[in-house]
Amino acid sequence: MNMIDFEYDGIKLSSLKMSISSFSDPDDEQELGNNLELVNVKGQFADSYFSAGYSYTEPYQLEFYTTKYNCDNYDDFVISDAELNTLIRWLNRKSYCKFKPIYNDGSFADVYYMAYFNMSLLKAGGDIVGLRLTLNCNAPFGYQETKVFNGTLGSSPLTIEDVSDEIGHLYCKTTITVKSAGNLTIQNSADKYNAVIIKNCKENEIITMSGDTKIITTSMDSHKKLPNDFNFNYIRLVNTFSSRTNTFTANLPCEIKMEYNPIRKVGLVI
């Protein structure tokens, strides 16, 4: 499995007649990222430590090379000024854009990273023949393309298997269409102490919430006190090392749509 191409902000490297190149030993070890650092605490009279927390030491970063590849003319390997300008404008942005690796065996086709590039030039005989690219990600890991789940709660549960590589919880973007007025409670079997409670719901009211942004909205102007009626427990998916199952139930009939991006710790293989 090797990365032979990539897509950045919807444009493929190969569409610009460039290819991924390697100037290192093909058996070199490559980092996967995901480097953790535990916060260790030891009692005054104890000999062993226990973990009181953790943090990732740095976002994921990878360096690789790209050179020109023109299958119509193998002697056309020099990058012109115009081609260089196009590459710089495309890759060297002031914001994180979607980066998708493309592997020769089709592996991890639904995995992406949010990243920007730094670059330096490779010269031979005074000509620019390649670029050294440094991929800088916004996190120590990648993401899987958005997964969407739909269900009708109240009459039947909605069961979701959290496929994230990260043990813990991930918030979802959730849209709830309430079919009967009342005080709504949504419970997750894997998150028993984080029940979602929204009081004074109206019939056919559409409530949208995002745990990442901590924003909740309603389709009805008459529910002006929604922030006061909400307990600020946002819907999330939970997984442990032994279980990934999340079963959602509700006390009122409602349609629910949940969207999330699982964390993937697969790294990049050049």
What spans do the regions from the language model cover?
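A short, compositionally biased
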Residues: 1-3, 91-97, 179-181
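Polar/acidic, low-complexity leader/linker segments enriched in S/T/G and N/D
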Residues: 1-40
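Short amphipathic beta-strand/extended segments with alternating polar/hydrophobic composition
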Residues: 13-19, 109-116, 194-201
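Oligomerization/assembly interface segments of phage tail-like spikes and tubes
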Residues: 41, 47-77, 127-141, 246
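Solvent-exposed loop and beta-edge segments used for protein-protein assembly and interaction
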Residues: 54-60, 91-93, 125-129, 166-170, ...
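Short beta-strand and beta-hairpin "edge-sheet" elements
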Residues: 96-140
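Intrinsically disordered, low-complexity segments enriched in serine, threonine, and glycine
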Residues: 143-270
